[in-house]
Amino acid sequence: MELTTEAPFINNNNNNNNNNNNNNNNNNNNNNNNNNNNNNTPNNTSYSNYPQSGYVYQNYPLNNNNGGNNNNTIYYNQPQQYDPNYQTSVTSNSYPQYSYFASPNIISPIPSPCLGSTPSPIPSPTIYQYSNNSNNYCAINTPPLTSVPSPILNCNNKKRPEFNNNNNNHNHNNNNNNNNNNNNYNYNNSNNNQQQQKQQQQQQQQQQQPQQPQQQSQQQQQQQQQQQQQQQQQFKQTNINTTPKNLSPVLQSVNSSASSTPQIQSYFQQPQYQQQYQQQYQQQYQQYQQPQQLSSANTTPQTNERPNYSSIIQPNQLFSQMVPSFINGAINNNNNNNNNNNNNNNNNNNNNNNNNNNNNNNNNTTTNNNNNNNNNNNYNNITYFQPYTPFSIVDNSSMIVPDKQPQQQQPQQQPQQQQQQQQQQQQQQQQQQQQQQQQQQQQQQQQNYNDDSNKNNNNNNNNNNNNNNNNNNNNNNNNENINSSNNNNMYNICPAAAYQNIQFIKEQSNSSLSSSQPIPPFNLYNEQPQQQPQQPQPTQSQPILSSSSTSVFDINHHHHHQQQQQQQQQQQQQQQQQQQQQQQQQQQQQPQPNLSSSSYADNNNSFQSSSGNVWESQSSPIQSSVQISSPPQSNQSSIAPAPAVNLSASASSVATTTKQSNVKKQKQQQQQQQQQQQTKRQELSDSEDDTDNGDDIDEDDEDDDEDEDDMEDEDTSSSSSSSSSSSSLSKKSPAVKKSGLKKSGRSKSSSNESKAKGHWTKEEDEKLRSLVDLHGTKRWKYIASLLCLRNGRQCRERWSNQLDPSIKRDAWTLEEDRIILDAHSKYGNKWAEISKLLPGRTNCAIKNHWNSTMKRKLSKKQYDFSSLPPISSSIVSDNSSSLSTPTDSISSSPSTSPITLSSNVVVNDFDSQQQQQQQQTYQQPPPQSQDSGNNQFNFNNNNNNNNNNNNNNNNSVESIKLYTNVNISYI
């Protein structure tokens, strides 16, 4: 047999509870019973009425078939008693972080940490389970008086029933304050038929008999109270606090099996179980209903302690205050409680209030939406979360679980109620008059805020009515709007974040409870309990709001709008001040010429000649300044009018400023021209060095330098043209000087040395070799971009000084020393020029050799060139190409004419060489771009990539050849 997924005890309980209430109430409540019976079928579409129980359950974990996953848990726990004077402060690590809720007829037999070893009574065996993953629901029927473990059913594809009717039933039970409440908790299957028969008989008797006077009903209530007190004293003497032997131990999670279900079903059918269960529960409930008072009301226990409570919370007395809107039905319960409480307090309005309850029962979906509308109007900070999910919201460590004192049931006094009604009506009239006066004042002061203030006042008027019918009717008119707006946002919010913004209302304490003392709201996060808001004194800007008729949210809403309005006014004032300051600054900065003066035209021309389109940019501010003198518009009434512009007075100042600016511009132009001339001279001198130095600067680098020069010139011209005052020109003059001091390509590359510093690594050397093999030795800038962290100069120097395979690394010879001495006597320390005479030797190597060895030998005269031959072909070629090559002996076509030296060459004497070099005259020929030239004087400079000869011919030489055609004649 399969277990049913519906709650079997709920439909009949509606009749029992309502009939108990009907004993004291008239036939008006019977209409509610009829409507409730029509709605016994569960409504699967609406899920805002669960849980309908007023029980607040403590956290108590239980493993399940998912291996102890806390998301899928059984909803059973220990209820706690409510005490307005007692507060607990328990750390979050004291108890597990779960929150469970059961159906109205569930209380667990498990001893909770708060009760110690004392269990609570078990009115029903039904346990409900939710699944977080799949939005499903199932019910488990377990007999609590047996040791049979309760099976955990698989909740796949099973929907949960709704308990729409239980909400109203429990409301009636709590609010009537009759002694028959003890019998309302007897949820039994066996006696349902008998109870229904008794109910029908009682209803017939009530219809036949006339209504008894109020005094007789008061006497009956007093008798019932005395009987109840006697029963409680008897049960106190007995040891009922001990756990019964036949109660089940801690429920264990066991997988559903076929063997356990027949035992459960068969046990339910036994009449012994039902009778025994009813008797034990009645005894235990009457004993547990009397709470155990604490020694000191205001004491707070330690972190791991809880008060020893052993009583059951009355349904719906504390649920509306302690757990507002755990789900959507929590606030629905509050609204229904208000109506039912008014029925008990105001006997004259029973019929009207009962009609409202009937509407709520027959239209489950509409009542939920109506209540949601109330929440949106009164609880702006309350949010909703997903249904069918375990509620892990309440933190029991910060839960306030005080002990509620038993309320003595007093007879109803009709005169007192009438007096209260009259007082409330008088207060309402006074409030309405004050509100009307305040509305008139607000309309005069704040035109934009009229709509919001009227809405707030209308809401307050509706809340001040004694009959709650007006509120419900207003909400019924807004069902369609709520369905379209709130349903989408209602179920997609995280549960943990839902209670961070909850604010509890205290006004419902008078309506939900029959006692005169209000109960403080439930605190979730161990915060200080909120004090009851004091009635504000009437002022011109704030209406009077009474605590009995208005809510905290209405007051907060009103203050919130006032704060917003003040902020808007402050922002507008700040904006107006900023606009005034900007206008004043524009008037001070912008020169305004005298249109009538003749000097204005001359100045205008000077502007056009020096700075281009400067005058066009200044024409618009003048027009704007002229327009400022006009009176302000209507929408700018608060802004002070700008002062009028006096063009005739400002003409002289404009003329002086324009002359000064023109003089400064002329001076700057002269300085720029001088700087340009200097830079050209430096470039010419550097270009001579660069041409001699070979590929120190690539063609790509030169093109980039020229482009940058053009860009900088444009920037300087635009900066000078855009500046209209002397201050702006003085600020931008240093930039002009920087642009004028343009350095050569060599200095630019040296400035980029900061891009990468440090020694070269092996990886960089290998990468540089591969890039040079691919791209050659002329595109150093491109190679540097591929290499990263190095610039073109660094790459070129690294290649030419270290990585070039043509570099000689052997010892220096006497021939090389003689060539260096001869070249140094002419060129000095121009090592790049000297390196051209020695293929395979770098300028750095020559410089180091000169500084380290050759200077020392020269000072000591240790050189002896006698061992050398008189002259060798290579040396002669070197000397002839570098030292003794006159321009007259060079022809445009290749020839074999001999080369004559103008003086004798004495090899052994170094002084004679210097004299010879002084007598000779050399003229450096201009560079030639043609490939034609004398191949006689070309050297094998492919290794160093220096193709520039003394004639600056770009002829590539592939192999070394002896110059057999060169005839040297000695004079």
UniProtKB/Swiss-Prot annotation:
Keyword Protease set for record: no
Stretches with biased composition (Basic and acidic residues): 754-764
SUPFAM superfamilies per UniProt: Homeodomain-like
GO term, biological process aspect, one: positive regulation of transcription by RNA polymerase II
Pfam families xrefs: Myb_DNA-bind_6
Spans traversing the lipid bilayer: none
Biased composition range(s): Acidic residues: 685-716
Residue stretches of biased makeup (Low complexity): 11-40, 163-220, 332-381, 528-551, 563-590, 617-661, 668-679, 717-730, 911-955
CDD domains noted in UniProt: SANT
Gene3D superfamilies: Homeodomain-like
Polar residues composition bias: residue spans: 41-52, 294-309, 591-616
Residues in HTH myb-type domain copies: 752-803, 804-858
DNA-binding stretch(es), residue numbering of this chain: 780-802, 831-854
Keyword entries, A-Z: DNA-binding, Nucleus, Repeat, Transcription, Transcription regulation
InterPro entries linked to this entry: Homeodomain-like_sf (IPR009057), Mediator/Homeobox_domain (IPR052145), Myb_dom (IPR017930), SANT/Myb (IPR001005)
Entry GO MF terms: DNA-binding transcription factor activity, RNA polymerase II-specific; RNA polymerase II cis-regulatory region sequence-specific DNA binding
GO cellular component terms, A-Z: nucleus
Compartment annotation: Nucleus
Location of region: Disordered: 1-54, 151-220, 288-309, 329-383, 440-487, 509-764, 874-898, 911-958
PANTHER family: HOMEOBOX PROTEIN BARH-LIKE, MEDIATOR OF RNA POLYMERASE II TRANSCRIPTION SUBUNIT 29
Name this protein carries in UniProt: Myb-like protein AA
Organism the protein comes from: Dictyostelium discoideum (Social amoeba)
